[in-house]
Amino acid sequence: MSNILIIKHGSLGDLIQANGAIKDIKNFYKNRKVFLLTAEPYSIFMSECPYLDGVIIDKRLPRWNLFYLKKLKDKLLRYDISKVFDLQNSSRTKFYSRFIIKNVEWSSTETTLGTGQKKSDYDQDPVLDRMEIQLKKSGVETDFTKNIDLSWATTDISRLLKQYANNEYILLFPFCSVKHQKKKWPYFKELISEIKKDFKNKYPILLAPGPEEIDEANKLNGKVVLDDNNSVNIKTLISLINKAKFVITNDTGPAHIASHLDKKGLVLFGSHTTAKKVSIENFNFKALTVQNLEDLSVETVLSEIKSRLN
């Protein structure tokens, strides 16, 4: 029997958001194997996802690298794919539909658009709404696309909690990728000092940096959570967020994790996008939005934290 391929290269936040859709696709194709094509940094994490039968790594080398593209094409042919759910909907995956995984049924933004509808307009809708519409167009029931269950992605972190907190804690993510510096609020160090002062050190302030963020984290006057002097893995990261009393973050992957774990917290937004478009707000997890993140004061953020924590 032929198999199903889902494409979602990343980022971490995008993969978290796609988790419900992946579950819906697997539930719909119970008797078929479902594989995920993704980027290498997420392959180990997603290989533990119970809704997948396997993970295929795409190194996403330049398209002029014909040797790599031929190798990828030959590899995918061996999986006997009959349908592709393109949840990445990028120029790269559009290229794949034409030259790498041809002659199979594709579900993508382009196959979802209504008559006369432009992709640029469609892409303004909330991401989970778009995912739901795309799956429904293929007849897939969407019980979990907007009801994401991350219970499979947690692990026992009692050892780390004993080392760094031992009780309730506030978890901060003041980081963002190098290419998305406009998402970064510049006053986290000052905020940490004010939280400690205002709450009289009631809550340890924890930071969980990625490998390239450890030096930055060490300058922020919080407790830097490491595992054997290395950044924690994704399941440990999710578990730290899950156990936190409150989460404060830039618009990054951990924000989406906190949202879908229904944690109390704040995500700080500038004008780069909207909270609605990335489907991040809920009853407990709220966005503070300003035109320019440099204009968002420590006092405003602290006031919101106090009102939500008390």
Give the role of each language-model region.
Residues 33-66, 223-226:
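Conserved nucleotide-sugar phosphate-binding/catalytic loop shared by glycosyltransferases and other
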Residues 149-216:
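Active-site donor-nucleotide binding/catalytic segment of nucleotide-sugar enzymes
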Residues 108-109, 121, 228, 256-310:
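Nucleotide-sugar donor-binding patch of glycosyltransferase catalytic domains
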Residues 7-19, 45, 177-186:
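A short, glycine/small-residue-rich beta-strand->loop->alpha-helix junction that serves as a flexible
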Residues 12-27, 41-44, 191:
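Short amphipathic alpha-helix
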Residues 187-266:
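Donor-binding and catalytic core of enzymes assembling or modifying cell-surface/extracellular glycoconjugates
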Residues 1-12, 172:
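Nucleotide-activated donor-dependent transferases that construct or modify glycoconjugates
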Residues 56-149, 169-178, 272-275, 281, ...:
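Conserved nucleotide-diphosphate donor binding/catalytic pocket of glycan-assembly enzymes
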